């Protein structure tokens, strides 16, 4: 059972508050000891075992605690000012139901404020509520329900019980509290703590309202109710947690320094995130970073932290191996100790004389070096007398040396004015305030002794190991560390930020580490040569005792052809080994003694000027020729041979190299002579490979493909894609060890990841698929949907927190697709256009393409630059935020574009139904009155069948067989003469004259006579001639009559033919005119079609350009991977394979610089393109609103003409518009008048047209007319068309360019602005020339289609030319007939006709007169009969019958 001891020291009351209370009690902790207990439960629980720390914060204090007894009133409240924190407690001793009262705590801030409202429901699970919201909270509340309605955008809206476990018995042990900071709020409620991070401003004013506490006293004692502890300053408590016992006490001595400098190591050796890193520095072997962030390997993994209370006179020895960690503060790690850090934790200046007298470094080989400093120039005899290594601020300059046996080996330099940290690495590096002060051989142990000091400051000793971390540095000191030890922390490291905003981030490539080596070579018979190089070093001392390497040191090569100066490789393989000896001398150059102590040295061969390192020769480097020489004659490069001592490296000789690049000679680590296939493959795992001379890191997998040619296969960027095993022909693929992915981070946690392969990553196990990628998430997709199917937006109902393009991720990790906003309908007002003055129009459909969005691009900068090489990644961190800037620029650009595109697009269901050509041409959606037409919206050719003439069923025609079997004689007949003649004759030729017909009173006979008729009339004629002399000429009368009748027929037929000719000529000429006009319209239609096809071709060309632009940019970016940017190779792995680390770093740095430049160029191009697309997106939006949803008034905005209507359709990355416009085909040229200037005596005034859509012009008849600008329709102007102006003067303002902004505020001289930018921001560096190449991505290739459209357009144009020629030919075929003379003959009627007419008149007239005058009731006969009847008989009355109704229909 854990024990708890509380040692309290009562602090005197130093402040107080004036409370508007009827009774006020100010007391110390008293019965409120549970406050400290609660505090310990919240804070000591996070401490590791074996901890001894001082905690400082705005904690509750021992005193004062206030008890305020107020009257039962709602309108009063207590106000506290300048607070940092507030704690309160509810005591339950002697409390009845009447004592349970409400409390409303309000902390005012901007824009957020805090309220904690407590009700009287002490036993309820939701008896209180905390609200952190925007707004102004009330000081009091009467609400019975707990809500946060007073504010908006609440950061915290949480209900909690007043008493733990909802039991009143636990209330007395409960602590409530609030702390507020500029970036966070901490709340202590019902035994739990909440920390909410956000930016806010706090006034420090707290109000306590609704304290309707009772004034009752129990047994004469004031009842404890609500108790308050206002906190104004930081309080410190010391917590010691050892062996399961926690001891807490007030900290009274150096509390602030202890909090700032001593921490408890967290499990895993991590330093707490809230540690201040006071006097901790970034260790560096080169220049010191002043301020910034970088990812680096630093000794920040603490194996043991040993706090030393104060300086004590003592001597200590600390070793890197086998260190005893018995005084550690926190957990202990058993990792290898890399660096021991001595940190002086002080806040005030510590004078010199308080520190170590000397630091002794026990190096390998048993040599002990000492480091000490002196305040003036010293002699050799006094080096060991009064030297020191002071901590803190020195009172003067200190000159430091490396000593050996009291002799100075090397002068190190001047000690910094203030020594705050000393760090010593086991690799022999000695750091002061982070700077590498000295380097020597590896160190085993450190010994030091401390001087006695009167200061009571303390210091710490930290045994640390190297780890990768994101380090923030300010003024050369570490201020914050983020360990790169988890998935989310790796992203933080890659983004160079400790706090990740919600968004998508590229997943950093994991470090490969030590992997197996795969080698693929061609099978061959190998011969092997071992090259042994012996280097004999000569060492001696200088006048001050420092070791000096002699330039007489000897290099011995194997003998070849009786020559030891040059050695060439003559075998297929070779291995090079170096053997080093060391001899010394006293003063001369005779080196016979063994090197001991500080004279001990080792020979090393450095890279020098060669593009490969000496120690990499046996790492499968290949050559066509390779020779080593001691002479520079004919050499390509050289190695530097150096003597490495305990203090420095000294170059003594040079080893020259003669080489040619190729594959004939291979450097190998061991002898492999004979017939061998030396290939070694490690399949299906990450391996470091050398495949036919190409090196890298990747996963090798066997494939089923068969390729006939080639040994290895690369991409355009030079990356190895696969290779062939020549022995069996098997093809192997090579893929990267790590595949780039995008992690979705919300509230600092990875909730999902987008990847191109179906493999678990980032610890995410739940996954789903989309058409373009796999998505892994913390969200567990239900079993209702089959895993691996395409996700549907309705699967998850949640609000996305982050979006990228058209996808979003919710807080629970679920992936949703963002739907476009739907609208209820379209409004399409009609308006006129602003055009010139045409007289005729033609309809044209014009195509226009506008880009609306670009495809989002995400680039893993470190992957592109380094391709996963761990050493390159370390170098890349030196470029600070270069990658972060590139990635964030692309991500922010994509998010901004997604937001704009999402807010732009709306979908109308009604408009969607008409969004296809079929629906637009269909009459189903039209009113019934229009459905009789086949196609309203289009011009389909099948509609012509309805206007073609139909067959006449009344006409009778013979069949084709009848036309073949019968001979036909076709003549022209007169009316019904021929038909009547045939009926009369009945087929008898003798009845020819009897059946003669009359046409217009003239006797006629059909003009055709058969053989029988000709015989009959010939006989009649012959008989008449023969008998004529005898008086028988009358026989020829039938012949004469028949001939004359037939001549009459011909004459009348000629007249009819003449009339028919006139009708025919008129009709033919009219037909020719119609044909000419029709062909003219066809010609015009084909011409317009040609122009339409040209616009379609241009639009498609623009679509192709838009789609391929990004691919070209990516191709451009990919091609840069082939450029070496003046490095020895474009392959980073190959560079590190050939060179030592330092030389390779210099070469790789060139690649990093070049590739970052290429990335910056790509990002600049992308952002520029996005800016252009943003403008075109607004243009598309304007065109949708003005062209599609309404009718444009602007000429040329919706097509080149007067706009009628437009259709929009989706196109790759944009929208394509089909504008239907009226194109003027004929114009009327007029002289427009701006107005009329009139004189009235001495007064001059002007008249201008009121309507700006009208044009005033003066015609040839000197009259003024007005016409609309849309079409030439002149009319006479009236007075109502004009308005009067004051004068006729026209004023012009003469201004310079500098005056234009004062006249036109938004005027910008673009040319001058660009010129200023170029002058002021001219780069002072040279950007490498980047050439374009083909990118292996999908391209939209419409070149063939565009060429076909252009060819068809040209062919149609040629057709129009041919039609114009045909029209001219048709015009030349107009008929001009020669009219026949028409003779009119009048024939008088015979005498007997007139006789008959006279007889009829004589007979009929008397008869008619008699009938009219003598008959009837009033006639003469009628009157006579009536008189006779009346005389002979009496009068009788007629009998009448009843009248009946008569219906007339």
UniProtKB/Swiss-Prot annotation:
<feature type="region of interest" description="S2">
    <location>
        <begin position="777"/>
        <end position="1449"/>
    </location>
</feature>
<feature type="topological domain" description="Intravirion">
    <location>
        <begin position="1411"/>
        <end position="1449"/>
    </location>
</feature>
<keyword id="KW-1043">Host membrane</keyword>
<feature type="signal peptide">
    <location>
        <begin position="1"/>
        <end position="28"/>
    </location>
</feature>
<feature type="region of interest" description="Heptad repeat 1 (HR1)">
    <location>
        <begin position="1037"/>
        <end position="1156"/>
    </location>
</feature>
<dbReference type="InterPro" id="IPR044874">
    <property type="entry name" value="Spike_S2_CoV_HR2"/>
</dbReference>
<keyword id="KW-0175">Coiled coil</keyword>
<feature type="coiled-coil region">
    <location>
        <begin position="1338"/>
        <end position="1380"/>
    </location>
</feature>
<feature type="transmembrane region" description="Helical">
    <location>
        <begin position="1391"/>
        <end position="1410"/>
    </location>
</feature>
<keyword id="KW-0732">Signal</keyword>
<feature type="region of interest" description="Heptad repeat 2 (HR2)">
    <location>
        <begin position="1305"/>
        <end position="1402"/>
    </location>
</feature>
<dbReference type="GO" id="GO:0019064">
    <property type="term" value="P:fusion of virus membrane with host plasma membrane"/>
</dbReference>
<keyword id="KW-0945">Host-virus interaction</keyword>
<feature type="topological domain" description="Virion surface">
    <location>
        <begin position="29"/>
        <end position="1390"/>
    </location>
</feature>
<keyword id="KW-0325">Glycoprotein</keyword>
<dbReference type="InterPro" id="IPR002552">
    <property type="entry name" value="Spike_S2_CoV"/>
</dbReference>
<dbReference type="GO" id="GO:0046813">
    <property type="term" value="P:receptor-mediated virion attachment to host cell"/>
</dbReference>
<comment type="subunit">
    <text>Homotrimer. During virus morphogenesis, found in a complex with M and HE proteins. Interacts with host ANPEP.</text>
</comment>
<dbReference type="GO" id="GO:0044173">
    <property type="term" value="C:host cell endoplasmic reticulum-Golgi intermediate compartment membrane"/>
</dbReference>
<dbReference type="Pfam" id="PF19209">
    <property type="entry name" value="CoV_S1_C"/>
</dbReference>
<dbReference type="GO" id="GO:0016020">
    <property type="term" value="C:membrane"/>
</dbReference>
<dbReference type="InterPro" id="IPR044873">
    <property type="entry name" value="Spike_S2_CoV_HR1"/>
</dbReference>
<feature type="region of interest" description="S1">
    <location>
        <begin position="29"/>
        <end position="776"/>
    </location>
</feature>
<dbReference type="GO" id="GO:0075509">
    <property type="term" value="P:endocytosis involved in viral entry into host cell"/>
</dbReference>
<dbReference type="Pfam" id="PF19214">
    <property type="entry name" value="CoV_S2_C"/>
</dbReference>
<feature type="region of interest" description="Interaction with host ANPEP">
    <location>
        <begin position="657"/>
        <end position="801"/>
    </location>
</feature>
<keyword id="KW-0812">Transmembrane</keyword>
<keyword id="KW-0946">Virion</keyword>
<feature type="short sequence motif" description="KxHxx">
    <location>
        <begin position="1445"/>
        <end position="1449"/>
    </location>
</feature>
<dbReference type="InterPro" id="IPR043607">
    <property type="entry name" value="CoV_S1_C"/>
</dbReference>
<feature type="region of interest" description="S1">
    <location>
        <begin position="17"/>
        <end position="776"/>
    </location>
</feature>
<comment type="function">
    <text>S1 region attaches the virion to the cell membrane by interacting with host ANPEP/aminopeptidase N, initiating the infection. Binding to the receptor probably induces conformational changes in the S glycoprotein unmasking the fusion peptide of S2 region and activating membranes fusion. S2 region belongs to the class I viral fusion protein. Under the current model, the protein has at least 3 conformational states: pre-fusion native state, pre-hairpin intermediate state, and post-fusion hairpin state.</text>
</comment>
<feature type="coiled-coil region">
    <location>
        <begin position="1104"/>
        <end position="1148"/>
    </location>
</feature>
<keyword id="KW-1161">Viral attachment to host cell</keyword>
<dbReference type="Pfam" id="PF01600">
    <property type="entry name" value="CoV_S1"/>
</dbReference>
<dbReference type="InterPro" id="IPR042552">
    <property type="entry name" value="ALPHA_CORONA_SPIKE"/>
</dbReference>
<keyword id="KW-0843">Virulence</keyword>
<keyword id="KW-0261">Viral envelope protein</keyword>
<feature type="region of interest" description="Fusion peptide">
    <location>
        <begin position="1022"/>
        <end position="1043"/>
    </location>
</feature>
<dbReference type="GO" id="GO:0055036">
    <property type="term" value="C:virion membrane"/>
</dbReference>
<keyword id="KW-1133">Transmembrane helix</keyword>
<dbReference type="InterPro" id="IPR002551">
    <property type="entry name" value="Spike_S1_CoV"/>
</dbReference>
């Amino acid at each position: 059972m854990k024990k708890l001891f509380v040692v309290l020291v009562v602090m005197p009351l130093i402040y107080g508050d004036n409370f508007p209370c009827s009774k006020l009690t100010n007391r110390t902790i008293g019965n409120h000891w549970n406050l400290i207990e609660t505090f310990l439960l919240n804070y000591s629980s996070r401490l590791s075992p074996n901890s001894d720390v001082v905690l400082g914060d705005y904690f509750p204090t021992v005193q004062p605690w206030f008890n305020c007894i107020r009257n039962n009133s709602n309108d009063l409240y207590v106000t506290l000012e300048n607070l940092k924190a507030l704690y309160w407690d509810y005591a339950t001793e002697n409390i009845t139901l009447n004592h349970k009262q409400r409390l409303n705590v309000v902390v005012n801030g901007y824009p957020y404020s805090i309220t904690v409202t407590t009700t009287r429901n002490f036993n309820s699970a939701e008896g209180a509520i905390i609200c952190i919201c925007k707004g102004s909270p009330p000081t009091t509340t009467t609400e019975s329900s707990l809500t946060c309605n007073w504010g908006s955008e609440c950061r915290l809206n949480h209900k909690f019980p007043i008493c733990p476990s909802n039991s009143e018995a636990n209330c007395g042990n409960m602590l409530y509290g609030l702390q507020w900071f500029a970036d966070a709020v901490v709340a202590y409620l019902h035994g739990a703590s909440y920390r909410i991070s956000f930016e806010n401003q706090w006034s420090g004013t707290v109000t306590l309202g609704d304290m309707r506490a009772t004034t009752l006293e129990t047994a004469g004692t004031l009842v404890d109710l609500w108790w308050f502890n206002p906190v104004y300053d930081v309080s410190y408590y010391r917590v010691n947690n050892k062996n399961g016992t926690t001891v807490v006490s007030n900290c009274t001595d150096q509390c602030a320094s202890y909090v700032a400098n001593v921490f408890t190591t967290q499990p895993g050796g991590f330093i707490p995130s809230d540690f201040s890193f006071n006097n901790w520095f970034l260790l560096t072997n080169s220049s010191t970073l002043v301020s910034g962030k970088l990812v680096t390997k630093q000794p920040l993994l603490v194996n043991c932290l040993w706090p030393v209370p104060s300086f004590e006179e003592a001597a200590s020895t600390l070793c890197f191996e086998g260190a005893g960690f018995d005084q550690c503060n926190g957990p202990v790690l058993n990792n290898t100790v890399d660096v021991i850090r001595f940190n002086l934790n002080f806040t005030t200046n510590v004078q010199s004389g308080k520190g170590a007298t000397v630091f002794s470094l026990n190096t390998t080989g048993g040599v002990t070096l000492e480091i000490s400093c002196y305040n003036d120039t010293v002699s050799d005899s006094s080096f060991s007398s009064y030297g020191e290594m002071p901590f803190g601020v020195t009172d003067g300059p200190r000159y430091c040396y490396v000593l050996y046996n009291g002799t100075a080996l090397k002068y190190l330099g001047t000690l910094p004015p203030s020594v705050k940290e000393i760090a010593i690495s086991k690799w022999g590096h000695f750091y002061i305030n982070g700077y590498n002060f000295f380097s020597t051989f590896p160190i085993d142990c450190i010994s030091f002794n401390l001087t006695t000091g009167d200061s009571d400051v303390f210091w710490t000793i930290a045994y640390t190991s190297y780890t990768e971390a994101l380090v923030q540095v300010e003024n050369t000191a570490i201020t914050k560390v983020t360990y790169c030890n988890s998935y989310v922390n790796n992203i933080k490291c890659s983004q160079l930020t400790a706090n990740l905003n919600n968004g998508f981030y590229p997943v950093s490539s994991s470090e490969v580490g030590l992997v197996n080596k795969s080698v693929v070579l061609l099978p061959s018979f190998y011969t092997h040569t071992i090259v042994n190089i012996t280097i004999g070093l000569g060492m001696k001392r200088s006048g001050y005792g420092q070791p000096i390497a002699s330039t007489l040191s000897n290099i011995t090569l194997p003998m070849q052809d009786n020559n030891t100066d040059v050695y060439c490789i003559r075998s297929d393989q070779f291995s090079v080994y170096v053997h080093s000896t060391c001899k010394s001398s006293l003063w001369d150059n005779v080196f016979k003694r063994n090197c001991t102590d500080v004279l001990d040295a080792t020979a090393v061969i450095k890279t020098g000027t060669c593009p490969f390192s000496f120690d990499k020769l046996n790492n499968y480097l290949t050559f066509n020729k390779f020779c080593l020489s001691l002479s520079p004659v004919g050499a390509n490069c050289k190695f530097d041979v150096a003597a490495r001592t305990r203090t420095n490296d000294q170059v003594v000789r040079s080893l020259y190299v003669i080489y040619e690049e190729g594959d004939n000679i291979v450097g190998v680590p061991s002898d492999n002579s004979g017939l061998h296939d030396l290939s070694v493959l490690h399949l299906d795992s990450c391996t470091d490979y050398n495949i036919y001379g190409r090196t890298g890191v990747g996963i090798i997998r066997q494939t089923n493909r068969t390729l006939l040619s080639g040994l290895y296969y690369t991409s355009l960027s030079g990356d190895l894609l696969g290779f062939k095993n020549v022995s069996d022909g098997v093809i192997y693929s090579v893929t990267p060890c790590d595949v780039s992915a995008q992690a979705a981070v919300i509230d600092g946690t990875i909730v999902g990841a987008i990847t191109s392969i179906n493999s678990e990553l980032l610890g995410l196990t739940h996954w789903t698929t989309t058409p373009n990628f796999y998505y892994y998430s913390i969200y567990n997709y239900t079993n209702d949907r089959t895993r691996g199917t395409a996700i549907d937006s309705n699967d998850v109902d949640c609000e996305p927190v982050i979006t990228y393009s058209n996808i979003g991720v919710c807080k629970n990790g679920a992936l949703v697709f963002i739907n476009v906003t739907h609208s209820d309908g379209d409004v399409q007002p009609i308006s006129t256009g602003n055009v010139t003055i045409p007289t005729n129009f033609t309809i044209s459909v014009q195509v226009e393409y506008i880009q609306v969005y670009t495809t989002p691009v995400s680039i893993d900068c470190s992957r592109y630059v380094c391709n996963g090489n761990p050493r390159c990644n370390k170098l890349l961190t030196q470029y600070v935020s270069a990658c972060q800037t590139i990635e964030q620029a692309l991500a922010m650009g994509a998010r901004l574009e997604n937001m704009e595109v999402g807010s732009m697009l709306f979908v109308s269901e009604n408009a969607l139904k008409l969004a296809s050509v079929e629906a637009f041409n269909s009459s189903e959606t039209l009113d019934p009155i229009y459905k009789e037409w086949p196609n309203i919206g289009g011009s389909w050719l099948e509609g012509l069948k309805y206007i073609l003439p139909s067959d006449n069923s009344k006409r009778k025609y013979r069949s084709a067989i009848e036309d073949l079997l019968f001979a036909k004689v076709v003549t022209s007949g007169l009316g019904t003469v021929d038909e009547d003649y045939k009926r009369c004759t009945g087929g008898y030729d003798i009845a020819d004259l009897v059946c003669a017909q009359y046409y217009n009173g003239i006797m006629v006979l059909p003009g055709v006579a058969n053989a029988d008729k000709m015989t009959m009339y010939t006989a009649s004629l012959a008989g008449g001639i023969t008998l004529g002399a005898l008086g028988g000429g009358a026989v020829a009368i039938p012949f004469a009559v028949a001939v004359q009748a037939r001549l009459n027929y011909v004459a009348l037929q000629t007249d009819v033919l003449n009339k028919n000719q006139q009708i025919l000529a008129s009709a033919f000429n009219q037909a020719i005119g119609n044909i000419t006009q029709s062909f003219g319209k066809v010609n015009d239609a084909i011409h317009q079609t040609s122009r339409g096809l040209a616009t379609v071709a241009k639009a498609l060309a623009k679509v192709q350009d838009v789609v391929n632009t990004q691919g070209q940019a990516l191709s451009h970016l990919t091609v840069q991977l082939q450029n070496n940017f003046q490095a020895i190779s474009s392959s980073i792995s190959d560079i590190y394979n050939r060179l030592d680390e330092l030389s390779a770093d210099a070469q790789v740095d060139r690649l990093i610089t070049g590739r970052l430049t290429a990335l910056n160029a790509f990002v600049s191009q992308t952002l520029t393109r996005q800016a252009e697309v943003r403008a075109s997106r607004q243009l598309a939006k304007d065109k949708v609103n003005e062209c599609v949803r309404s009718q444009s008034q602007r000429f040329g905005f919706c097509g080149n003409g007067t706009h009628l209507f437009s259709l929009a359709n989706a196109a790759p990355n944009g929208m394509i518009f089909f504008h239907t416009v009226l194109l003027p085909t004929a114009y009327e040229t007029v002289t427009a008048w701006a107005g009329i200037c009139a004189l009235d005596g001495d007064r001059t005034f002007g008249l201008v047209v009121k309507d700006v859509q009208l044009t005033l012009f003066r015609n040839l008849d000197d009259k003024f007319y007005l016409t609309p600008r849309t079409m030439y329709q002149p009319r006479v102007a009236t007075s109502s068309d004009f308005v009067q102006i004051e004068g006729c003067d026209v004023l012009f303002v003469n201004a310079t360019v500098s005056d234009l902004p004062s006249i036109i505020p938004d005027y910008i001289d673009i040319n001058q602005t660009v010129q200023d930018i170029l002058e002021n921001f001219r780069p002072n560096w040279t950007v490498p020339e980047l050439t374009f190449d083909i990118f292996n991505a999908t391209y939209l290739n419409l070149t063939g289609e565009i060429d076909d459209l252009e060819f068809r357009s040209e062919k149609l144009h040629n057709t129009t030319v041919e039609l114009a020629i045909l029209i001219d030919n048709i015009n030349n075929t107009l008929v001009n007939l020669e009219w026949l003379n028409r003779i009119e003959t009048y024939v008088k009627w015979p005498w007997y006709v007139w006789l008959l007419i006279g007889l009829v008149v004589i007979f009929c007239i008397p008869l008619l007169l008699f009938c009219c005058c003598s008959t009837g009731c009033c006639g003469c006969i009628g009157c006579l009969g009536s008189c006779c009847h009346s005389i002979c008989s009496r009068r009788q009355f007629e009998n009448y019958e009843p009248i009946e109704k008569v219906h007339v229909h």
